[in-house]
Amino acid sequence: MPIGVPKVPFRLPGEEDAVWVDVNRLYRERLLFLGQQVDDEIANQLIGIMMYLNGEDETQDMYLYINSPGGAVLPGISVYDAMQFVVPDVHTICMGLAASMGSSILTGGEITKRIALPHARVMIHQPASSYYDGQAGECIMEAEEVLKLRDCITKVYVQRTGKPLWVISEDMERDVFMSAEEAKAYGIVDLIALETS
């Protein structure tokens, strides 16, 4: 568990005294957090929690708060797929940064329930290869796999934003950073949270 995760009082049914736990209370409230780079561990954790909450109650929505620089493509796609699989709607809320796979996951929230905080930033780009050293055949196979993943992510953005394929493909050629307003206009989020005074 990362440093800085708050401990909250949580009382188990039938117990008199509450105990201080880290995030179990938040999970029971159906609040999930992606506050780091996407990797196998955090993806498996999020998917496991979503599946558990889906089995526990299919009528209550889940809320996924995102502040992520992105990360590995396959774990990110698995989180996206899990969000589409579960019965409850998954609200996605961008706080800070949703870059790379973080923005793909943000886009995967239930349409009309994707939110960005006023000063949030979103970034899209194409997936990169991590395989630079090896035999030519291995590099070619890796390049083919990266192209398949790029096609998959492009289709996700096309489906979830309503933008034409050529626009998404062109924009993914480089890092495209967006403000909350620009992300809304692009179709990655549907709402911008209001500042309270």
UniProtKB/Swiss-Prot annotation:
This is ATP-dependent Clp protease proteolytic subunit. Its EC number is 3.4.21.92. The keyword Protease applies. The active site is at S100, H125. SUPFAM superfamilies: ClpP/crotonase. It catalyses: Hydrolysis of proteins to small peptides in the presence of ATP and magnesium. alpha-casein is the usual test substrate. In the absence of ATP, only oligopeptides shorter than five residues are hydrolyzed (such as succinyl-Leu-Tyr-|-NHMec, and Leu-Tyr-Leu-|-Tyr-Trp, in which cleavage of the -Tyr-|-Leu- and -Tyr-|-Trp bonds also occurs). GO terms for biological process: protein quality control for misfolded or incompletely synthesized proteins. Its main location: plastid. InterPro entries: ClpP, ClpP/crotonase-like_dom_sf, ClpP/TepA, ClpP_His_AS, ClpP_Ser_AS. Keywords: Chloroplast, Hydrolase, Plastid, Protease, Serine protease. Cleaves peptides in various proteins in a process that requires ATP hydrolysis. Has a chymotrypsin-like activity. Plays a major role in the degradation of misfolded proteins. Belongs to the peptidase S14 family.
